[in-house]
């Protein structure tokens, strides 16, 4: 990659049908950071059995807005599954925030959860445990190997579509009917 314009931060990685790794099959991953050293992303369509109320209880943070307790906690990826990540809109900066775009940020600090507990948190958010990570050149090789389709991100896919529809909705952004794709790559 020769220029920053070629990096895929603020893009979706849509798992191609041939990607059978159980961590990533039929996933949509938001790339939050991508540079010459590698990439970091959060899977946005794999809810776990945990709820926000479980995380708040574990962290001993009061949750004053009871209905928020039912928000699902997502499997964000296989790297550091004990670490929490919150994708949120608007892109307000907290103690440890990575701004992904003008309207979206990723925060890992406790202060955002404390604000959520008080009912003062972000308007829309997705809480995930773990992340997807790629070393230098690894993501680029996986794209060449036909593991991923990429598309510009859209906050509506993250926050408005139910998790089970996000894979198709992300592919629809680039006009691809993912159900019609084959698992066979055409590199012959």
UniProtKB/Swiss-Prot annotation:
Q: Which residues cross the membrane?
A: none
Record's InterPro entries?
A: AlgH-like
The domain of life for this entry's organism is Bacteria
Any one GO CC term of this protein is: cytosol
- Output the SUPFAM superfamilies linked to this UniProt entry: VC0467-like
Report the family membership. Answer: Belongs to the UPF0301 (AlgH) family.
- Protein name according to UniProt: UPF0301 protein MCA2336 2
The source organism is Methylococcus capsulatus (strain ATCC 33009 / NCIMB 11132 / Bath)
